[in-house]
C-alpha cells in the first residue's frame, strides 16, 4: 500500500515537455542510485559532464534541476533571481529553525526581506564585524598560548580551530561566556552531523511515516529541545539585565541577542517585530552557518599549505614581513596580506564549504529553452563550476597565484567562483566569516613553524572529504608546532 501511494505521488518529469536532460531512473526511487558512492557534489559533476550543465534528476518524489556552469548559474542567481529566491524546506529546517523562520531558509517575501535587512544593517554589517575585533583577537591569542604550551607535541589543529570559532561566535552572540555554552555548542555539532547529505524523508514528502522510520524527526527534536532550553535561559538573562534605551547592556558592548531583542519589544517604535522563536531561529543560523563554514575553510587552508611546503613558506614570509614591519597585528595588517587572501580564494575554489547551493523554483519558468517546473529544487554545483577547465586553467591544480591581481573574488559577482552563492540569497555572513578566517590563519603562520607528525610525508597528506552541512576534511589535521616568533603578551 505504501509503495502504491508513493507511486501515485511521484511527478513524472519525462512527461514534462522540454525539461533538461538527465540520467535513467528506477520506479519510485528515480535517480537515487546515481548518487551512491562519491560525495554528491562530485557525483553530480560527473553526471553533468555526460548530460550537460543543466540537467534534471528525479530523487524520490522531488524534481531536482542541477546547474553546473557559470552561464546557467547567472540565469538562476541573477537573470531569474526572484523566481529562484526561495529555499526548499526540509525536516531539518522546519524543526531546527522553528518552521524555517531563520535568515537562510525562510521563504522569499516580506518576512525574509525584513530579517535580511536586520542582518545586513545591524547583525553582520562591516561596522558590527569590526566592533567584534577585540573578541576575535583575545580568543585567537588564547589559542596561540595553548598551542605554544604544547610546542614539539602533536596538536589536533582541527579540534582546536573548531573550538575557537564556536567560542568566538558564542561570545559575539551572547556577550559573555555562559555555563551552558559548551552543551549548546555540542548540540549544534550533533545537528550538523545529522543534517548533512540527502535525508530520505525529504525526498518523499508525502510519506511522513519515513520521518519516524528513519528516526530523523525524533533525533532533530531531541537536540532542538536541548538547544531551545539553553537559548531560553540566555535570552531571559539578557532581558533581566539593565539596558539603556537603545538596548545596550550597561557597562558593555551590545551583542547580537541585544540587537534582536530590540525587535521583540512591542513598546519600541520599530515597524517590524520578531517573536522569541524568530530570534532563536536567527541565532541558530549564525551558529550553524557562520561557525562551521569558517572552521572548515581554516582547516582546508592549513591542510593545503602542509601539502606544499613551498606555498606554506610564501604565505609565512608575507605574514611575517608585514607584521614585523608594522610592529603590531590589526585589521589594516590583515588587509595587506595579498598572498594569503589569494590562497584562501583558491581554497574556496577547490573546497567550497557548501558546494551545493539550494534554491526553489517559485513558479515555472524557462531557461535557454528548457522548462523548469514550479516547486522543483535547484542545485547550483559551485564545485563543478570551480573545477571546470572552461573557466580555470589546470582546474585540479592548487595554485593561489591565479588569484594574484585578479578581479575575481568570492562576493557573488563572478559566476565562475561562487563559494558563498550570489544574488538575493548570497550568504549574509561573508564579512563575519572571513574576518575570523584571515586573523586565525595569519597568527598561526606568524607565531609557528609547522611540521607533520613523524612518518607522514607532505605529498601523502590525506585530503579525503566528508560530506555534511559543509564539506570538511575527513581526517583531523594533526601538526607539530614550533615557536617562531614571540607570543602576544598575556
From Swiss-Prot:
Pfam families: p450 (PF00067)
GO MF terms, alphabetically ordered: heme binding; iron ion binding; monooxygenase activity; oxidoreductase activity, acting on paired donors, with incorporation or reduction of molecular oxygen
Transmembrane segments: none
UniProt keyword annotations, A-Z: Heme, Iron, Metal-binding, Monooxygenase, Oxidoreductase
CDD domains xrefs: CYP71-like
Enzyme Commission no: 1.14.-.-
Residues that hold heme according to the record: 427
Iron-sulfur listed as a keyword: no
Leading EC class: oxidoreductase
Cofactor annotation: heme
Protein family (similarity comment): Belongs to the cytochrome P450 family.
Protein name per UniProt: Cytochrome P450 71D11
Provenance organism: Lotus japonicus
Amino acid at each position: 500500500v505504501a509503495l502504491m501511494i508513493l507511486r501515485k505521488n511521484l511527478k513524472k518529469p519525462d512527461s514534462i515537455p522540454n525539461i533538461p536532460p538527465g540520467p535513467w531512473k528506477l520506479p519510485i526511487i528515480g535517480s537515487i542510485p546515481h548518487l551512491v558512492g562519491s560525495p554528491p557534489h562530485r557525483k553530480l559533476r560527473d553526471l553533468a559532464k555526460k548530460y550537460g550543465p543543466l540537467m534534471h534528476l528525479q530523487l524520490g518524489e522531488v524534481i531536482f534541476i542541477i546547474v553546473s556552469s557559470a552561464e546557467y548559474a547567472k540565469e538562476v542567481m541573477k537573470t531569474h533571481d526572484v523566481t529562484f529566491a526561495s529555499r526548499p524546506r526540509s525536516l531539518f529546517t522546519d524543526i531546527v529553525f522553528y518552521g524555517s523562520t531563520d535568515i537562510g531558509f525562510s521563504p522569499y517575501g516580506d518576512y525574509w526581506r525584513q530579517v535580511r535587512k536586520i542582518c545586513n544593517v545591524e547583525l553582520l554589517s562591516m561596522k558590527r564585524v569590526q566592533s567584534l575585533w577585540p573578541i576575535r583577537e583575545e580568543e585567537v591569542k588564547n589559542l596561540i598560548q595553548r598551542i605554544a604550551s604544547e610546542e614539539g607535541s602533536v596538536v589536533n589543529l582541527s579540534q582546536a580551530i573548531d573550538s575557537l570559532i564556536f567560542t568566538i561566535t558564542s561570545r559575539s552572540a551572547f556577550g559573555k561566556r555562559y555555563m551552558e555554552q559548551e552543551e549548546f555548542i555540542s548540540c549544534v555539532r550533533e545537528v550538523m552531523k545529522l543534517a548533512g547529505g540527502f535525508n530520505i524523508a525529504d525526498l518523499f514528502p508525502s510519506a511522513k511515516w519515513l520521518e519516524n522510520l528513519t528516526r530523523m524527526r525524533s533525533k532533530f527534536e531531541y537536540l532542538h529541545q536541548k538547544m531551545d532550553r539553553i537559548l531560553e535561559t540566555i535570552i531571559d538573562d539578557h532581558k533581566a539585565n539593565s539596558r539603556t534605551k537603545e538596548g545596550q547592556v550597561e557597562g558593555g558592548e551590545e551583542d547580537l541577542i541585544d540587537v534582536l531583542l530590540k525587535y521583540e519589544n512591542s513598546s519600541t517604535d520599530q515597524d517590524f517585530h520578531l517573536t522569541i522563536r524568530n530570534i532563536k531561529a536567527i541565532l541558530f543560523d549564525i551558529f550553524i552557518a557562520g561557525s562551521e563554514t569558517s572552521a572548515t575553510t581554516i582547516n582546508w587552508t592549513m591542510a593545503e599549505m602542509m601539502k606544499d611546503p613551498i606555498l606554506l613558506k610564501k604565505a609565512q614570509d608575507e605574514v611575517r614581513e608585514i607584521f614585523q614591519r608594522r610592529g603590531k597585528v590589526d585589521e589594516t595588517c590583515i588587509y595587506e596580506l595579498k598572498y594569503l587572501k589569494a590562497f584562501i580564494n583558491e581554497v574556496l575554489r577547490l573546497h567550497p564549504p557548501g558546494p551545493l547551493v539550494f534554491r526553489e523554483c517559485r513558479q515555472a519558468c524557462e531557461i535557454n529553452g528548457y522548462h523548469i517546473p514550479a516547486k522543483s529544487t535547484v542545485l547550483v554545483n559551485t564545485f563543478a563550476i570551480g573545477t571546470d577547465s572552461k573557466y580555470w586553467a589546470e582546474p585540479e591544480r592548487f595554485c593561489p597565484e591565479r588569484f594574484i591581481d585578479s578581479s575575481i573574488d568570492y562576493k557573488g559577482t563572478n559566476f565562475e567562483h561562487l563559494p558563498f552563492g550570489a544574488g538575493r540569497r548570497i550568504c549574509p555572513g561573508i564579512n563575519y566569516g572571513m574576518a575570523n578566517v584571515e586573523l586565525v590563519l595569519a597568527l598561526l603562520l606568524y607565531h609557528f613553524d609547522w611540521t607533520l607528525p613523524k612518518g607522514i610525508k607532505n605529498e601523502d597528506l590525506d585530503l579525503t572529504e566528508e560530506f555534511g552541512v559543509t564539506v570538511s576534511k575527513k581526517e583531523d589535521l594533526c601538526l607539530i608546532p614550533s615557536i617562531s616568533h614571540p607570543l602576544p603578551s598575556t
